[in-house]
Structures are given as structure tokens and as C-alpha cells.
């Protein structure tokens, strides 16, 4: 299948894991060449080769272990013994990675290979900062912001289109910034829209409006 070496459509897939009071937001980005990137809560990142990417996807989709082993045999043309050995080793580490109750050190606690920094070239950023406005309710003399830039702001429909495009690019994390983003009346609606798409959202703010209980 064209651009589907694993038989799975490339893109970003979102999952949630909950154990008691603990939660993990998980994003798996599958690239066109079969490689994958796993992000946990938008702050932990793991690069996967095609076999690891396929196993990660099938585990997250809660596919039966025997079916996963058969899929590995079929896709990578390996014998059952090899597929079983690789799967057991990977699943042991992967279950720890995605567990909300565990926080393993990738270097000390897991049987994972490390990569030289910047040796991988991502197909898209892992985070996008969106400046909703350059207006601000502070007037700090040391601020780099220029008041004359506070014009030609996008409306809510335009920002939703931006968010849709960012998600389609495979970017799982957006941070709303400015200026002061809480000056945008429709900020809560943008956050809701981004979360419905599957994104993790963040906010760069001076916090003044957040001190108002009616705003929260």
C-alpha cells in the first residue's frame, strides 16, 4: 500500500491511560516511512523503528497479543519465535512507558537504545505556539512586545482552521500565547476545540485574569 508500509494510515493517534487518580495523555505519530514517535503528556518523547511503531500502535489499540505476533510475522517476514521474543521484550518496556503509575528512566530502567541529539529530523514540530494577540493588560517597560503590533487579529473561525491544520500536520501540543492570550474572549472555546481534536493545550499568561474566579 502506497505510503503505508505498516498497513496503517500515517498520522497522529491519541490515547488516554488512567490508573486511579493518575492519567497519561499519549500521542503516537506514525510517519510515512513506517517509523514512529511516541509522546507522553507532551513532555516525554520516544523514537520507534517500524517494528516498534507497529507494536506500539497495536498495543494501544488493545489488539490481542497473538494477533500482534501474527501481524509481525506477516509484515516483517520473521519466524514466530523471533516475533514472540521481540514482542515480549518490547511490551515489557512499553507498558512501563505508558503507565500513569510508573515513571521509568529511559536510560537506567529500560532496555532502550539512545539516539544522538538532533540525529532525527521530525516530519513536523512536536509543539506549536500560537500568538492569539499582541495586546496585553500589563505595561512592563522591559517587555519585548510592541503595542503597535496589536491589530489584525484572527477571529474564532480562522483560529479553528489554524488548529485543524496544526492537528492535520501531526502536531499534538499547542500553547496559546501573546501578548496576553486571556484577553481573547473566545480563548475557552479554542481550548475546547483543540482538546476535542486530540491536542494537549498549554497557556502562557501573566495570570492576572486567572485570579478572577468568574473567569475560571
Model regions and ranges:
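N-terminal [4Fe-4S]-dependent radical SAM core
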Residues: 21, 28-38, 45-47, 90-129
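Short helix-coil junctions and helix-kink-helix linkers
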Residues: 71-80
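Conserved alpha-helical substructure of the radical SAM core
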Residues: 75, 85, 89, 93, ...
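Short capping segments at the starts of secondary-structure elements
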Residues: 57-67
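Helix N-cap / loop-to-helix initiation motif
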Residues: 64-65, 79, 155
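Acidic, low-complexity/disordered tracts enriched in E/D and polar residues
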Residues: 1-57
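Phosphate/oxyanion-binding loops and surfaces in catalytic or ligand/nucleic-acid-binding neighborhoods
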Residues: 62, 97, 169
